[in-house]
């Protein structure tokens, strides 16, 4: 049995969890999310908690894989409950001279030192805000109830100009430490 999987998920007030045909649907003030759960995992909703247990009679013979699925689906359902009640937020910072970002609705316009601007259409589930203050690096603030989608979009944005190790220029998460290298002049002595 998975250590993570056997922990119960408490359902906060204002959130409803339903189960139909191995699909768990979570509705809350921030939105609605659905997730298919493998038949090797049983889902039970009782007195304000969601419990996931392993189905011993499942067709899945590999016990290790069943244990892994147990922890995986518990984490996915827990992320959905947190997402529809509180939401998720990630901040990206643009480090570099002339690096800018502006948004028009759900379209972000990036100026990242290339000969052309990069435009990115965001999914409708993600809310975006850009901040540019004098003498500070521009920020992109992304919010969503879907943790997986938010992380995927942030990784895509970061891939436009990954931080380089010499000067640290590029797009990075706020609080992310970039491993720095000394230049060739430091190693020549």
Curated annotation (Swiss-Prot):
<dbReference type="InterPro" id="IPR020040">
    <property type="entry name" value="Ribosomal_uL6_a/b-dom"/>
</dbReference>
<dbReference type="InterPro" id="IPR036789">
    <property type="entry name" value="Ribosomal_uL6-like_a/b-dom_sf"/>
</dbReference>
<comment type="function">
    <text>This protein binds to the 23S rRNA, and is important in its secondary structure. It is located near the subunit interface in the base of the L7/L12 stalk, and near the tRNA binding site of the peptidyltransferase center.</text>
</comment>
<protein>
    <recommendedName>
        <fullName>Large ribosomal subunit protein uL6</fullName>
    </recommendedName>
</protein>
<dbReference type="InterPro" id="IPR002358">
    <property type="entry name" value="Ribosomal_uL6_CS"/>
</dbReference>
<comment type="subunit">
    <text>Part of the 50S ribosomal subunit.</text>
</comment>
<keyword id="KW-0689">Ribosomal protein</keyword>
<keyword id="KW-0699">rRNA-binding</keyword>
<dbReference type="GO" id="GO:0003735">
    <property type="term" value="F:structural constituent of ribosome"/>
</dbReference>
<dbReference type="Pfam" id="PF00347">
    <property type="entry name" value="Ribosomal_L6"/>
</dbReference>
<comment type="similarity">
    <text>Belongs to the universal ribosomal protein uL6 family.</text>
</comment>
<dbReference type="GO" id="GO:0022625">
    <property type="term" value="C:cytosolic large ribosomal subunit"/>
</dbReference>
<keyword id="KW-0687">Ribonucleoprotein</keyword>
<dbReference type="InterPro" id="IPR019906">
    <property type="entry name" value="Ribosomal_uL6_bac-type"/>
</dbReference>
<keyword id="KW-0694">RNA-binding</keyword>
<dbReference type="GO" id="GO:0019843">
    <property type="term" value="F:rRNA binding"/>
</dbReference>
<dbReference type="InterPro" id="IPR000702">
    <property type="entry name" value="Ribosomal_uL6-like"/>
</dbReference>
<dbReference type="GO" id="GO:0002181">
    <property type="term" value="P:cytoplasmic translation"/>
</dbReference>
